Amino acid sequence: MQWIYAKPGTQKEPVGRVDEAFIRKRLSREFAPELHSRIRREICEAIKSVEVRGKDIVLCSVIEQYVRRTLEYDLEIMKSRGLDHFTVLALEKNLPFEFEGSAFDGVVSGDAAVPSHRKYAFKGFIDRLDSFDDGTVRVVDYKTGKVSDDEAKVMGEEGNDTSKASAIFDSVFAEDSRERPKIALQFFIYNLMLTLNPEGRALVGGRKVTNEVYSVSGLFKNEHSEYSLPQGVIDKASEMLRSCLDGIFDIEKNPTFRRTGDTDVCNYCDFRMICGK
């Protein structure tokens, strides 16, 4: 997906200014063969095959429609706001950061122990960072898979309501929750990337950060759901994340830390062979 708005000959270097002519060229009949060829080539690379076969032909068609609808959707947003362009700031941007844990007794200096903090290293990629006006930076996450209604609710008014958003993060960090709103956690981490990473802060430049998921169903239903996380919710989520990480790394102070009771999540765990769950 990133190459749609990348400079020619690059994979991730953002093109910058995107206007109507740029989008219409990529939606044109003349561009269709190049779009089709590019998608097939990327699928072949992903599945390590020389050609697209069987169900992957269907996948190719779905992705092609998704790419075209993404371009149409961006044009619709631009026109609905009376703009002649928007700016792509970053594509598949890696913004690693360190998250500070709670204070604990550190080295002894004189007669007192100097408090220290455990550092947790995070690494992640933001699919797309763009801006439709001077006061806002938008995080866009591409979702070609299914997005449930429960997850989608964090993209609506709940995301802009402090009390509702706070309740969502109670669910994010609840033990053995099958209704965990993963999208809320994902955008919270993106927010930390843009706050705690120097390059991320520079990209934002003091502007308001909003979030939006480009899901297949959402795009074709024309559901425009852009939201921001209130600072109070970010602070609460940060404390919850800190408590969770501290508990993992300090078992003596957190005797309730245990293996999950929901074995479905074990399917995606890199440590399941060690755990033996």
How would you name each of these model-derived features?
Residues 1-277:
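RecB-family 4Fe-4S metal-dependent nuclease core
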